[in-house]
């Protein structure tokens, strides 16, 4: 049953538009909200519900009702997501566009207000010039003197910015984890990122990142839901990666490094889930942003490692593009300048890695190694490296790839000064111009401070190898850097204290004497006491520091090692048996190792087989368990879906029943109210306040209305009758009094009309005279111009006539030319048509001739065919005649044989009488006696045939000859069936001289008729002559059927 008309979406939309037209937008929003969130709306068609939703979101944006919009959009998504996803996208896009438009309008309004305030400020009126600085103005200036723009934005723009942010968050919540709305979800997320970047909303950006992160985490949790996203799908994962890369770019632009690092972790997690390799252009962006993050966090080691990975990716992309194995869309476009810049940054970042640790805690004394190890492992995984990077490994990799040749010259010189030819006494002089060049580049300027730390570390390490103590002034002179990168003595002392705290330096500062003393106690070396102190350093290799000479501490520490080596060499030369014993022990160990290797190998193989079997068994059990679990889960899901479907169906039915009942009650109440209102407004005298709606019905209201209308009609008739009587008397009195004043009024009217006529006539005459005078004056003025006008008109006419003649002649020439061309065209066309007609006539004649020839050929063929058929027919006729003759001869022979057999049968009584040979008759095919024979009753067919032939006689015998007694013809057997002509129906009068020809065929006579024709049929041995004593003349002709009464008449 369709919903009632007043709850259709079209009617709701019309009602809302009417409320908006009268300025009641909140009421219209309430109407739309109630309709959208109603359960009845689920059965409405989407095509009629979409305009309602568009108007609904428009009103929500205008009135800033975010919560109402969220409720309505959630309901609309649940209704339309299974039928039409496009309409959801249309509504949500409209929602976002309206919110963005409101923000733009608010900004324009704020700019207008600010410009008006700025323009009005200089020209403001001051009441008292001596009291300009009142306490109120001072307080206002203190509080908001320079904040007028901010206050305007907070009052006008900020509420709409908040609403726009709520819009983005609402749309993302509606679209989350829905595979059918995934593209719209990603598009909205990108728009939200641009919103945060455009308006520098850092707090909202953090919340947005957390929101998207929660959505991805919940995707696996709700994977069993309908339309859930599948991160295993490559396209879905690619869209999420694109969104995260945009998130990373915006985080870097907003300088939210913590969020950028978390975005990097999100990207790494998604990349680990992806089955297809990421594009080189995406990974280049990934490593570039990761390098910037590490640089901001002052983690120069991983910053250099990220730049190294970035350079490797650029080199691979350039090689792929050069080989034609990739596209420019998937690989970043790289030029030679880009490669040089990247190589310079890789080398410079590697040089900026601190030689000693820059952290504030001491690794050997505080248990932070495990935490630092876990952190380094995480960062290594983000870079996709197998092991944590080190300074030496990065330099080795850079040298192997030839980065020194690609890098800029000043970077190459810097590498040679710091890593190849480091001289502490001239380091600052050599490096000053290089630092100036690096400082002039804004991108490289940030590496100056870590380079200074590396230079100071190298400086103090090599000074400690050469000197035991140096003056502070000497150190300050050595550590001179160019402006503006100059470092102060306090900075140098702070660096020394930090190195000593970490155990990387062993230096004492004596401010009284102004001397730096390097620790020379051979048993108190910080490195010797705390060998794990380098755990937190970026440099853990022993040979990384350039060794000018061994320090006393190293000499003391390595003394036992040198002594052991010397004694070992001495023993080898002094006692040869010592070397032999060593060799024998070595050979014995090798033999034992070889003997045990095979056994160990077999045990290893057996253990491997056992492990593989256990793994296979565990895998099979796990797969079986997973399949069983999936089966149970699928069955449970199906049961839940069926139960939910049944529950929804039952609820829908109950709701429909309740809705129909409620609608019927509501319609009835509305109809009653409508009738009461009509009764109240249309009929007077009825008090409806005392009526109860529950006790009323339509019939009672109709009766009340009719009764009241009848009452009013009677009252009206009475009033009309009374009023008409009063009006008649009054009108009669008025007319009687009026007759007295009519003549006087007529004379006055005539006088007024005459006066008006005279005034009008005088005015018309005066206007005519004035116009005449003006016309005469104008004629006198213009009469002086008549000669000039005539001459000018004559000249113009002559010129126009000459031009006309020229154009006429030209037109005639053109006409003649076109006429001749047309004549030629017509002649050509006629000639062509004539040729076509002749050609057509020729083709027609040829076609007729061909048809005539074909007809003649067909006729000849037909005549030939007829002739052939006639010849064949004649041949067939001759053949048929020949066959007929043969058949006649065969028949004659059969008849003769039959006659002989009959004669032999009849010759049993009188053997001496031999029957004469019957004349040959036309032979016919034998007839079969199909009637059954029982007990010898009735003659056989041979007997009947013989009787027939005997009854027929021979035509050659003379008619007057008397037959011999022995040759008396037997009485013919009565035959049935057969037509007797009228001239043969006389019976006894028929003469036997001209018997009728015997029929060539014999009809079948049923047994019953044969028995009915003769009560005592002749036996098989009875002769035809003994069956009847009647003369031959009284018998009918043989072969013809004679009725029984005819036979009886003939017998009589």
UniProtKB/Swiss-Prot annotation:
Residues 617-646, 794-1052 are annotated as: Disordered. Gene3D superfamilies: 1.25.40.860, UVR domain. Residues 1013-1028 have a biased composition (Polar residues). Its main location: cytoplasm. One of its GO terms (biological process) is translation reinitiation. RNA-binding component of the eukaryotic translation initiation factor 3 (eIF-3) complex, which is involved in protein synthesis of a specialized repertoire of mRNAs and, together with other initiation factors, stimulates binding of mRNA and methionyl-tRNAi to the 40S ribosome. The eIF-3 complex specifically targets and initiates translation of a subset of mRNAs involved in cell proliferation. This is Eukaryotic translation initiation factor 3 subunit A. It comes from Aspergillus niger (strain ATCC MYA-4892 / CBS 513.88 / FGSC A1513).
